Structure formats: structure tokens, C-alpha cells
Swiss-Prot record:
Part of the 50S ribosomal subunit. One of the primary rRNA binding proteins, this protein initially binds near the 5'-end of the 23S rRNA. It is important during the early stages of 50S assembly. It makes multiple contacts with different domains of the 23S rRNA in the assembled 50S subunit and ribosome. Forms part of the polypeptide exit tunnel. This is Large ribosomal subunit protein uL4. One of its GO terms (molecular function) is rRNA binding. Keywords: Ribonucleoprotein, Ribosomal protein, RNA-binding, rRNA-binding.
Length: 222
């Protein structure tokens, strides 16, 4: 059981949020978190790298100079890999790095990541985060009041809040995601995670995207 202080937009504590971390995930598997994070990172790779073999670069195959009598080392084509502008000995071709782990494992990893951040005291809870119109300066001031200025922060909202998204996207190191789109990579990358109370309620009652049936049995099998 964890008790998290609930703060308002001015940084003042207005209550306590009680959450049972055992209900989120009964344990934290570093190996599973690593596997899922590496999967997300691999899926983000473009894989557009391309190098040319000596048979693909332009240039003649003619011997550069005669074999003997010049005093130089023996040399053949200009397109060999030891020459400037020549081909590459072991080429890299475009490829698709993406792969997929089981859905259940991915969802369990998301909940494990949330529990890990709670256990490490890296989650901040705000009672309400609402603006009348997109305003970057207001979000920046709220983050400063919460002690999150100049800190990489993930803001987790209950739903798709375009006002908060547009207000926070221009701040370096700040990302805004609805709670249903959270995953192990987005949760573990920033130094702090700012949850609205409503978003944390969805994590608590299991109505966010990372919830699964038979949590304890699934984690035991992971």
C-alpha cells in the first residue's frame, strides 16, 4: 500500500492518495521490463541504412597500375573496400527491426512500470489539470510549482486532452499522453511522471489499457 500526496496547481498538498501497488502488479520483473522496452525501441528504428558493395559503387574495374616495377603496393580495382570511395566490405541493407511480444506480457510490463515508479517515489499526483485554452506558460508554471521544472516529465491525463497536449508539447523534456496509451517505454524514460487524480483512478480500478484479467496468474506465468 502506498500513500501519495495529492497536490494542487500551486504545489500545495491537499490530500493523500491511497493505492495498493499489489493490485497494479504483484511484482516487478526487470527482465520483462527490459524485453518490452527493447521491443518498443526496436519498433521505432527506421531501418533505412544502406551501404554499397564494391560491385555497386561507380568506377572502373581496371587495374590501377601494373603489378611490378612502380614501387607501390600491389593494387587492383579502385572500387575495393580499402580505397576511398570504394565499396564496403560488410554491407548493411535496409531491414525491418520491428517485432512483437505477446499482448499479455506488454500489458503486464506497463503495470509493472507504474508500480516501479510508485515504489521509487517518482510519481507526482495533481488533483486537477485544466486550462481554458492552450497556454504553454501556464503548464510551465504549474510544473515549476510542483518541483518539476527542468525535469523530463510525462504528464498522464485521463483522456485525450488536446488543450493540455498543445500546452505541454512545446516544453523541452515534457510529453503528454492519455493513460490508455501509456506503455513501459513512455513510463520509464522520463525522470518523473505526473498523474492527474482522475488518470490514477483509472489505473487503480483497472479501466486503463494496461489492465488484463487474472493479473496475478498472468504475472506468475511471465
Amino acid at each position: 500500500m502506498a500513500n501519495l500526496p495529492i497536490l494542487d496547481a500551486s504545489g500545495k498538498e491537499v490530500g493523500q492518495y491511497e493505492i495498493d501497488t499489489e493490485q497494479i502488479a504483484n511484482r516487478v520483473s526487470k527482465q520483462l521490463l527490459h524485453d518490452v522496452v527493447v521491443m518498443y525501441q526496436a519498433n521505432k528504428r527506421q531501418g533505412s541504412h544502406n551501404t554499397r558493395t564494391r560491385g555497386q559503387v561507380s568506377g572502373t574495374n581496371k587495374k590501377m597500375y601494373r603489378q611490378k616495377g612502380t614501387g607501390n603496393a600491389r593494387a587492383g580495382s579502385k572500387r575495393t573496400n580499402v580505397r576511398r570511395g570504394g565499396g564496403v566490405a560488410r554491407t548493411v541493407k535496409p531491414r525491418d527491426y520491428s517485432y512483437r511480444l505477446p499482448k499479455k506480457a506488454i500489458k503486464i510490463a506497463t503495470r509493472m512500470a507504474i508500480r516501479s515508479r510508485i515504489d521509487d517515489g517518482e510519481i507526482v499526483v495533481i488533483n486537477e489539470l485544466k486550462l481554458d485554452a492552450p497556454k504553454t506558460s501556464q503548464i510551465a508554471q504549474i510544473l515549476k510549482n510542483l518541483g518539476l521544472a527542468n525535469t523530463t516529465t510525462l504528464i498522464a491525463t485521463a483522456g485525450d486532452d488536446q488543450i493540455i497536449y498543445k500546452s505541454g508539447r512545446n516544453i523541452s523534456g515534457v510529453t503528454v499522453e492519455p493513460v490508455r496509451q501509456l506503455n513501459a517505454l513512455t513510463l520509464l524514460t522520463p525522470k518523473r511522471v505526473l498523474f492527474t487524480q482522475e488518470a490514477l483512478d483509472r489505473v487503480k480500478d483497472g479501466t486503463f489499457a494496461g489492465s488484463t484479467q487474472n493479473t496475478n496468474e498472468a504475472e506468475a506465468a511471465a
